[in-house]
Amino acid sequence: MKLCGFEVGLNQPLFLIAGPCVIESLQLQLDTAGVLKEITSKLGLNFIFKSSFDKANRTSGSSFRGPGLEEGLKVLEAVKTQIGVPVLTDVHEYTPIDEVATVVDVLQTPAFLVRQTDFIRNVCAVGKPVNIKKGQFLSPWDMKPVVEKAKSTGNSQILVCERGASFGYNNLVSDMRSLAVMRETGCPVVFDATHSVQLPGAQGGRSGGQREFVPVLARAAVAVGISGLFAETHPDPPNALSDGPNAWPLHTMAMLLETLVELDAVTKKRGFLEQD
């Protein structure tokens, strides 16, 4: 499958979707995107910048949600033109999807909305590549009918993204078998290494996270075999305005990606026995 001008799949090198969880300021987005572009260019890693203009599912009603649609799209367009990278953002049921699609290169559907049939179809009908996040409450094989809904619009540029499964209260677990199961959708599989270590609502009015396990799960997923890695990053995670506890520090992103690129090459060199 071609995505933003490059090929993705198990027979292609790993690609990266990364950026701050939410748009905090124009300068933060430009600086972060610039650092990520420099790192990925050195590694020969295809890169899509990600950030949200509205976080609609915050734990607390008083938490920062983002700058909103109008200002958010201006920031994403600035990143796209000034840094020279494709951009991704998530949309919601109330979002004017056509307007967002005039700026961004990839649309993303939130995990909590994965079962909303009309929403999935409406997003995919725009014709842009779509990254569909698997709900924390959904089994990996249940992504097959979701993809069928998506592709019924005539859009074949569909990615499926694993971001962990609910494991009791305030916890997520990553079953690496799901990455192989989700390949059966016929779509490139992306692993979200940062939301997978989230502890939803675990800090009372906000979610916690265990960012120390981001490289652990990222290495495991790449060793299983994935098309892309999703990782939210921030120059100062403790002071990030959204999902700081599970954001990977920007200053150590290069070291993490160097390891993953090497591991990806080894994993894909001989193919996958489970597909024989």
Swiss-Prot record:
It comes from the Bacteria. It catalyses: D-arabinose 5-phosphate + phosphoenolpyruvate + H2O = 3-deoxy-alpha-D-manno-2-octulosonate-8-phosphate + phosphate. Its main location: cytoplasm. InterPro entries: Aldolase_TIM, DAHP1/KDSA, KDO8P_synthase. Pathway: Carbohydrate biosynthesis; 3-deoxy-D-manno-octulosonate biosynthesis; 3-deoxy-D-manno-octulosonate from D-ribulose 5-phosphate: step 2/3; Bacterial outer membrane biogenesis; lipopolysaccharide biosynthesis. Belongs to the KdsA family. Keywords: Cytoplasm, Lipopolysaccharide biosynthesis, Transferase. GO terms for molecular function: 3-deoxy-8-phosphooctulonate synthase activity. It comes from Xylella fastidiosa (strain 9a5c). One of its GO terms (cellular component) is cytoplasm. This is 2-dehydro-3-deoxyphosphooctonate aldolase. One of its GO terms (biological process) is keto-3-deoxy-D-manno-octulosonic acid biosynthetic process. It is an enzyme of class 2 (transferase). Coiled coil: none annotated.
